[in-house]
């Protein structure tokens, strides 16, 4: 039996004002699907990219890539979740900005009562991103030293906590003294205020001329060259975002010093259920046990989604 729910849809790319509430019909799940009732929805910088058309999707587009809630129904063949389970997810293509939805069951991860729905909706995209970057892309080990750009951002604050559990020394870039205090609270050993310091020079000073083993760079165009200059011989450059703009085509000669460059993204690392659980189950355990803390900067009513985007 179908039900009508509110959802947020865009029919053109643009600012927050292009997001409109619409009524959508939600039916019964088919094979391999589940219907969930959202209790919380996550907002992320990638939502802005998609809304603005930087990462274009076919229009009209129902927004949102992560959420949490309870399972209302499951389709044939779904065995890893059942009706009544508390679940959270991050998934692509988008569709999370709604009261309820039918979706593939594969990305749904059970969360215990120790994790609130608000935390569940805030931890999946940023938390799984931080987890796979550090533990799978870079395979960080005790004794490594890393540079994390935007250390006071969502991925940075989670990533630094994971890094410290691995015995890694963290150098983080931030934009202000206030953000430096926040980054240190979450485990950053050394902060660089990029608005008034040369990042590569400070990295070399901190590491006594050696450079870092890995750079995690979500900023893109503005930080790319400085990131390469911060690496040690055989160092790894992990570029996973472009908040300052896309990195221009790279001259391979920039990698002199036997450097390595990679551009990973989350969803290839979670393509199968087995790969998803490698990251998601460990993240859930860490959060439920309070080994790491998921920062919740603020919450909004569903009706205030446009303001949430303005504040991102």
Functional labels for PLM-detected ranges:
Residues 25-42, 52-95:
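Glycine-rich beta-strand-centered segment in the early N-terminal region that forms part
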Residues 49, 80, 89-152:
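NAD(P)H dinucleotide-binding glycine-rich loop of Rossmann-like/cofactor-binding domains
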Residues 121-197:
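Mid-domain Rossmann-like dinucleotide-binding core that forms the NAD(H)/NADP(H) cofactor-binding site
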Residues 2-3, 273-312:
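C-terminal hydrophobic helical "lid"/dimerization subdomain
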Residues 88, 147, 215-216, 238:
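N-terminal Rossmann-like NAD(P) cofactor-binding module of classical short-chain dehydrogenase/reductase
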Residues 174-177, 222-292:
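Glycine-rich phosphate-binding loop and adjacent beta-alpha segment
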Residues 198-209:
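Short amphipathic alpha-helix with an adjacent loop that forms part of the alpha/beta core around
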Residues 86, 145, 169, 235-236, ...:
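Short glycine-centered segments of the SAM/dcSAM-binding site in methyltransferase folds
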């Amino acid at each position: 039996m179908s039900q009508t729910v509110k959802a947020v849809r865009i029919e053109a790319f643009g600012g927050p004002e292009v997001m409109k509430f619409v009524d959508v019909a939600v039916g019964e799940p088919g094979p391999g699907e589940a219907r969930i009732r959202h209790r919380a929805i996550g907002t992320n910088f990638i939502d802005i990219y998609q809304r603005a058309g930087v990462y274009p999707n076919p229009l009209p587009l129902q927004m949102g890539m992560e959420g949490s809630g309870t399972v209302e129904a499951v389709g044939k063949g779904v065995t890893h979740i059942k009706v009544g389970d508390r679940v959270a997810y991050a998934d692509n293509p988008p569709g999370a900005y709604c009261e309820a939805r039918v979706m593939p069951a594969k990305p749904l991860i059970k969360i215990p009562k120790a994790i609130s729905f608000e935390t569940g909706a805030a931890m999946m995209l940023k938390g799984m991103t931080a987890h796979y970057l550090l533990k799978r892309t870079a395979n960080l080990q005790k004794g490594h030293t890393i540079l994390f750009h935007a250390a006071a951002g969502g991925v940075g604050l989670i990533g630094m906590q994971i890094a410290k559990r691995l015995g890694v020394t963290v150098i983080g870039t931030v934009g202000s003294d206030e953000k430096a205090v926040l980054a240190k609270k979450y485990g950053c050993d050394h902060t660089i205020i990029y608005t008034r310091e040369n990042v590569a020079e400070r990295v070399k000073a901190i590491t006594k001329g050696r450079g870092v083993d890995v750079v995690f760079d979500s900023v893109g165009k503005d930080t790319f060259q400085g990131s390469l200059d911060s690496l040690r011989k055989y160092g790894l450059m992990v570029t996973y975002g472009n908040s300052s703009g896309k990195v221009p085509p790279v001259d391979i000669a920039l990698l002199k010093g036997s450097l390595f460059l990679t551009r990973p993204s989350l969803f290839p690392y979670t393509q199968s259920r087995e790969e998803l659980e490698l990251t998601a189950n460990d993240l859930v355990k860490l959060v439920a046990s309070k080994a790491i803390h998921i920062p919740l900067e603020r919450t909004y009513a569903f009706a205030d989604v446009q303001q949430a985007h303005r504040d991102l």
